[in-house]
């Protein structure tokens, strides 16, 4: 059975940690795997300044969704202008993804369900009904005081 066509694939720029990050992320999410690793050739090494034979890209799937990581050097860094959102069905899932992805990350970057992982990539760990919850002023007020989202507290504040 062939994989469905995906029009959009996140492409993440790392300094030298593309394969390490792919291994880390695929260890956290179900239905995840590294699908390909490419290495810098003599030609691409000369053009990029990256060592010949070192990892250039790591293609992987997170819960079946394609992602590519590039070892492009220190030129570009992740920032909060882009984040990956993980929709969670219950508090146990929120706790799991929050605990795994925040490990080694920046605790100062944790607010309102957002976290920054050890590679500097921002994630939002949210309940599946976050869009409905943030339509309620009580839920939003509760969220403003949270780091990791507490679904029960947000729902209680919505009533």
Provide a role label for each language-model segment.
Residues 2, 12-64:
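Core segments of cupin and vicinal oxygen chelate
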Residues 2-6, 75-78:
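Short, flexible turn/loop "capping" segments at secondary-structure junctions
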Residues 7, 54, 108-110:
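Short, small/polar residue-rich loop motifs at catalytic or cofactor-binding pockets
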Residues 14, 18, 28, 61-66, ...:
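Vicinal oxygen chelate
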Residues 130-145:
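A short, polar/charged loop-to-alpha-helix boundary motif
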Residues 145-155:
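Terminal, contiguous helix-loop blocks that mediate binding/assembly
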